[in-house]
Amino acid sequence: MIFNKDTAEKTAELLLQINAIKLNPKNPFTWTSGWKAPIYCDNRMTLSFPAIRNYIREEFSKNIEKQFGKPDVIAGVATGAIGIGMLVAEYMGLPFVYVRPEPKK
């Protein structure tokens, strides 16, 4: 579901600018889920670009408040969403937690 078409298009442009989107139809990527796909987006690359990470942080924060109101906490899945999740939580003045794929042993 796209909450804001302009934000989605600009984010896609930014991801393409920093080569975060990889295509390889001949040798599909294996995602953490085990799925194979010809496309991979390394969202963690955005953390190395201050202007891009700030844009994403602000747009995520605006969309969260618009769609859900002010939450009690921000959660990010390990490991790919920890960085952006922390940025959003800090920006919104909220606690942050991360979600593991399985309980810690």
Language model features: what each stretch is:
Residues M1-G69:
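Active-site-facing substrate-recognition patch
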Residues G34, I74, F96:
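Conserved hydrophobic/aromatic pocket- or pore-lining residues that grip, position, or stack substrates
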Residues S61, E65, T79, A89-G93:
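Generic short alpha-helical segment signal, independent of protein family or function
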Residues G69-A78:
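Short glycine-rich phosphate-binding loop at a beta-alpha junction
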Residues V77-T79, P101-E102:
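Histidine- and/or cysteine-centered catalytic micro-motif in compact active-site loops
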Residues I82:
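Glycine-rich SAM-binding Motif I of class I
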Residues G85-K105:
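Short, glycine/charge-rich flexible loops or terminal/linker lids adjacent to PRPP-binding catalytic cores
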